Amino acid sequence: NYLEKVIKDYKFELSENNIQDFLSIKNNNFSKFSISKVSDYEKNPYLFFVKRILGVKEETKVELDSLLMGRFFHAVMSDDRVVNFIVRSGSKIDIDIISDEDIVSRFNIRQVVNEVIYNNTSSDIVDVLNIISMLNTHDYILQNMINRLTIAIAVEIKYYAITKFTPTFLEKKFSLEIHNDVIRCRELESNKVVEKSLSKKYDIPSINFVGFIDRVDVLEKNISVIDYKSSKTDFSLESLELGFISQILTYSLACEMLFNKKSEDILGIFYREIAKLGKTIKDYRLRGLGNSDLILQSEFSEATSEVMFLRTTKKGTAIHGADVTKAYTSNELDTLVEKNLHNVLTLLEEIYNFDFSLEKYEIENNEYYAEKQTLFNYASGTDTRLTPKVKVEYKGKELRQKILGK
């Protein structure tokens, strides 16, 4: 059992020769980073060592896991037939008159979903259909997925009817090249190289930071960035303060460079929970960070709470006091993006130190207990996240002011 040998013999120290040998062989692949790769390190450095250095892969089964389901959902929602249906339907309704329930019943959403699912060559859809056909409960599973997609499309019809932001760029890849004190990215439309100078030089080699942005919606010169999630997810000021990576703030930086935009052009960066049964359309409003400058100037400022978990005052002239940690001015968003970028590059510095000890985390004093538990949890597919020793002293509005330097 090689895992037992890893636990018993590995002393959590890598010699300089071993590190250099590893980099000489693996550097092309190792120097390509993503949000998930950095997240492995921040939540548990030993997990990063096992998964990203030793290359021990997770056990996989032929089953409908959350990854496959997520790809299936993305493929259906990004199909041109679905996007066009959302825009056509959203253009026909008066949101002040029609109820959420009427949106589902008024439009033949299921017909569009069936057409896209059964007339599609996308491997993300075909693979799921093939697995479903092998399961005894395949009809129930498929009908459940169709029902969920029906709700998800109804959510987007309401969103479009209110905001008029159109899903335009779907599942777009980005690559940020970091070399010395400069970040480079090719603009999507012109293919020109866009550069951004770092505030300081970090002790890391040249790397590429890559990823996919699920969805970018467009209204005139403004964009809104949306990332689909299988469960309820929101932005955390506490995580940002602890030095962790924020997915949506990383996407904000990527979009600024990929589309040659400024923060003043971005309505917000949000998470959209993939619809489940038993909830209402309102449960799937956007969560994340809104640009208060654009929201308060928009035609839907009074109806903001209908499309996102962010409230404005009655006349839509200010952000509700209880929600000020969810909305920021363009300049304040710049500060958050810079803070997140510093977090990312600092984590990369730690990774390239090749020190995967767990001294910064709350762990048992027993020798290698946390490392053993990490292996067991990793093998069983359960959560491997550790709790940092450092705690955030401030909360809510006070933490907001601290991070923004106010």
What residue spans do the PLM features occupy?
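RecB-family 4Fe-4S metal-dependent nuclease core
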Residues: 2-406
